[in-house]
Amino acid sequence: MTAEIISVGTELLLGNILNTNAQYLSRELAALGITVQRESTIGDNHGRLADFVNEAKQRCDLLVFTGGLGPTADDLTKETVAGCYGDTLAFDPEEWQKIVDFFTRTGRKTTPNNRKQAMVPVHGHKVINNHGTAPGAWFEQDGHCAVLMPGVPHEMKAMWTESVRPLLLARQNCTLHSITLRVLGGESDIEYRVRHLLENTNPTAAIYCKTGECEIRITARAETDSSAEKMCRAYATKFYDLLGDAVYDEDVTGLEETLVHTLKEKGLTIATAESCTGGMIAQRLTNVSGASEVFGFGFVTYWEQAKAKMVGVEPAVIAKYNVVSAPVAAQMALGAAEAAGADIAVSVTGLAGPNGGDAVRPVGTVYLGAACGETVYVKKLFVSRPDRALVRARAAQTALELALRLAQGKVPADTQALAKSARHDAATLTALDSTFLKG
């Protein structure tokens, strides 16, 4: 089956809204084995939309629309597409009552123009919206299908999961199973190592890049659930063989979820001391339900005085080695662990830019510490692109990776170890600093 994704809304063409719906649907359709041939954005104009739909019907089997289902005059998707599929719309009292009830619950008056949202296909069928007021629609003509969903991302995703995806699966006479591997590292390196596995047709595998990691989504099609699952699992094993422990988990939302679960399993706690990341690590941890069982203290120590007062960094160490240095990162991590009484603590100090930096410490230089027991491990990170948001995101990701390796009982890669007992020793700190400056 082939498909096109059509996003409707002049606001998208003006750049006022980021179109995340198309990205989401591309991945979801690919996971169903449906080939997306084109993604398009059309403004709120009946004539142009109708012309486009009639052309697109000749190119593919399925049209997937988002947007233009609301109550205003420029919400034209439903009536336009209905006409292109030889259908009409009729008022649905049940949908109208749902709309009235929704407005009543939220303490608002239902205006007459909202009746437009209660218009549903006569020959096609409505698609229930359990999370908003605009129902979707499904049209068919001569074996060609069109599905219409709201433009609001959370409504669209819920409708896809609850209604549209099952409809499409039922039409394929097969079942699908997917596994998403979470892999630490850059896209080009990971893709090169597994490139021959990406050419398979069943199961399929696709890589999606994120900051500091990638997702590999493996999808198998078979006649039964158990067969599809076995195919997926067997193919996933091939990726594990090639990537080793760079694969840190499966089917999780991110590194923080795996870290929190690992800390729970091991009965460990964690603390953070952040400078340039300004609480991003703590935020990611607390995004995970149940994080309070393992995370109790997060120190944001942006000023030098805060580093000294809150996590015990010696002012003399800052003066001698610079606030962005390995000795400071080490003392921050050890101090955070002690102040919080935590088993593990991570620290970050760096230059996120765009201002500041010099030849020794250019913008993008970050030092991280990861303390556990009697040892602190220090790592230097350099983000070559001087993008403040990217530097901070990479730093937070790296800190979580260091913490995960310690929680797993492993020594983090590419780090220098410093004994807790030597954290005030001038010669040891100088040697640590020199090691990174030489590198």
Question: What feature does the model see in each segment?
Answer:
Residues 3-5, 146, 270:
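Conserved hydrophobic helix-helix packing surfaces used for dimerization/oligomerization
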Residues 140-212, 217-219, 227-232:
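Accessory alpha-helical/coil subdomains and C-terminal extensions
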Residues 227-439:
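Short alpha-helical segments enriched in small residues
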